[in-house]
Amino acid sequence: MKNYDEWAHVFKLDPNKEITDEALEAVCESGTDAIIVGGTDNVTLDNTLSLFARIRRFPVTCALEVSDLEAITPGFDYYLIPSVMNSQHVSWVIGHHHKAVKEYGEIINWQELLLEGYCVLNGEARVANHANAQTDLDIEDVVAYARLAEHMYRYPFFYLEYSGKKGPIDVVKRASAVLEKTKLIYGGGIKNAADASEIAAYADVVVVGNGLYENLKEALKTVEAVKEHKCR
Amino acid sequence: MKNYDEWAHVFKLDPNKEITDEALEAVCESGTDAIIVGGTDNVTLDNTLSLFARIRRFPVTCALEVSDLEAITPGFDYYLIPSVMNSQHVSWVIGHHHKAVKEYGEIINWQELLLEGYCVLNGEARVANHANAQTDLDIEDVVAYARLAEHMYRYPFFYLEYSGKKGPIDVVKRASAVLEKTKLIYGGGIKNAADASEIAAYADVVVVGNGLYENLKEALKTVEAVKEHKCR
């Protein structure tokens, strides 16, 4: 198992999307640091378990990004808990956590939980609407969220989420500059080695999600691109 | 200066309330572990500075509980930052923090900041209305907030706020039972030694606020009552 603070590249697989055994094998054996299982729509216990069982055949680190209380199941190496810092509704900042802990507080293994301070920045993405995110932010707003994540809340992760399109590199750069202990995750629009390499210059962790469903071959090249960057 | 994790008794002074020099001296020399400066209404830079300057003549630890961005001033030993965990509006959970850090992020000394996970429980109190708190909670809700504060957010403090009336001892007891590293602060309706002693059996820190404006002599006796309890 690869410890979360050593991650540089991760693939994010959506339980609600189809993936062939061959493609899944290529993803799991790609040399990526971890697979995150997570999605926005129709994440159920059934499709989560089904995907999890297929991934578990490979020795790759596997984390569940918890989006639905009903879809939590034991056995993952980590449980990533998003807090949407720029949501306009308390349920996405703390409410879902409270509900989960009220129900499962006594049996949770807290060591496996990792908080992600999300900053959702693509207003056209499903997740922005779903989580009622205020995406009309300037770069100083984002920097302030990064500082909150690092110093005030001491989250393990700060997650710049552009979901579906690539965000401006300046935002990644500025957020990176104020983070030390908190790891910067970047997700959104990474489809090939060049995309990944550009982001890896600043983000600690590059997430490749949709890209692998669109062009697997190109998506697989992001692993090497990120690793090369980190080994320089 | 007394480190925050050694506090057992604190007095909370409201910048918007009058206190004579004699009373202030008695409070500061009472043996309490710290004075918290904070209030809900009409906290201004002027009245905060004025109270602070008077307290600083004494060698007691002094913390500012930040409620208004305009009333922040350097020189306090600690800055307590409330996050109202059961607020129904994001501004009380994270919004005010974001605004403050956007403005002052570069000059903040993060070592002096202490997060307080507030659970505001007296629906009739000004603060509940002000912070739009959902006070209709059962004991399991409160326990879940305590667990969130301890394990998920790792706040230094979890604050049971009954502001103006005494809360049920069972709530204090149950919250206390799930907290280890996070210190349990209790505030609300503590007017005399008996009140303080009862709460000190479970809370790490007993706050005496309004009581000292109502009957100073009785309020001062709470210091000894808490200390006695902790030394048993």
UniProtKB/Swiss-Prot annotation, chains A, B:
- Pfam families, per the entry: PcrB
Task: Please tell me where sn-glycerol 1-phosphate binds in this chain.
Answer: K12, Y159, L160, E161, Y162, S163, G164, G189, G209, N210
Any one GO MF annotation of this record: heptaprenylglyceryl phosphate synthase activity
Q: What class of enzyme is it?
A: transferase
Query: Pathway, per Swiss-Prot/TrEMBL?
Result: Membrane lipid metabolism; glycerophospholipid metabolism
Q: For this UniProt record, give its keywords in alphabetical order, as a comma-separated list.
A: Lipid biosynthesis, Lipid metabolism, Magnesium, Metal-binding, Phospholipid biosynthesis, Phospholipid metabolism, Transferase
What InterPro entries does UniProt report for this protein, alphabetically? Answer: GGGP/HepGP_synthase_I (IPR039074), GGGP/HepGP_synthase_sf (IPR038597), GGGP_HepGP_synthase (IPR008205)
Q: Which reaction does it catalyse?
A: sn-glycerol 1-phosphate + all-trans-heptaprenyl diphosphate = 3-heptaprenyl-sn-glycero-1-phosphate + diphosphate
Binding locations of Mg(2+)? D14, T40
Could you tell me the superkingdom of the organism this chain comes from?
A: Bacteria
Q: Which cofactor does it need?
A: Mg(2+)
> SUPFAM superfamilies this protein is in?
FMN-linked oxidoreductases
Question: What Gene3D superfamilies does this protein map onto?
Answer: FMN-linked oxidoreductases (3.20.20.390)
One GO term under biological process is: glycerophospholipid biosynthetic process
Locate the transmembrane regions by residue number. none
Q: What EC designation does it have?
A: 2.5.1.n9
Q: Which NCBIfam families does this one have?
A: GGGP-family, PRK04169.1-1, PRK04169.1-3
Stated role: Prenyltransferase that catalyzes in vivo the transfer of the heptaprenyl moiety of heptaprenyl pyrophosphate (HepPP; 35 carbon atoms) to the C3 hydroxyl of sn-glycerol-1-phosphate (G1P), producing heptaprenylglyceryl phosphate (HepGP). This reaction is an ether-bond-formation step in the biosynthesis of archaea-type G1P-based membrane lipids found in Bacillales.
The record's subunit annotation is: Homodimer.
Give the protein family: Belongs to the GGGP/HepGP synthase family. Group I subfamily.
- The name of this protein is Heptaprenylglyceryl phosphate synthase
Q: Which organism is it from?
A: Shouchella clausii (strain KSM-K16)
